[in-house]
């Protein structure tokens, strides 16, 4: 049985996050990562519930960097949105520089968990 192609959606504010990334190359990579996640070619790490960020246990984090050298500088937070039976979409929640907890805090706020 073929896997159904997931839709790509985003929460309000995600587009603003993308445009806030420092250059076109980084912006494109953030969007390309979502396409690769949807295709099942890459996968993020599950997030959890933490005192500082709230409950992000239905979300995943994925690190990326167009430079490809050293520690990735950017973080993408996304989640799968289900219907009654299975995931039907990948929902982009937040993206930004990998500094502190900023992206996680933005994600929690957009999900109404802060």
Question: Across the structure, where does each feature detected by a protein language model lie?
Answer:
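An acidic, glycine-rich, mixed-charge low-complexity segment common to nucleic-acid enzymes
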Residues: 1-5, 53, 114
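Arg/Lys-rich, positively charged N-terminal/basic patches that mediate binding to nucleic acids
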Residues: 1-36
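A general secondary-structure signal for short beta-strands and their flanking turns/coil
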Residues: 3, 57, 71-73
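A residue-level signal for beta-strand positions that form part of recognition/binding surfaces
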Residues: 5-7, 59, 89
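Conserved functional hotspots at enzyme active or ligand-binding sites that engage polyanionic ligands
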Residues: 27, 53-57, 110
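A short, surface-exposed loop/turn module that caps and links secondary-structure elements
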Residues: 38-68
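Enriched for short, Lys/Arg-rich terminal
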Residues: 64-114
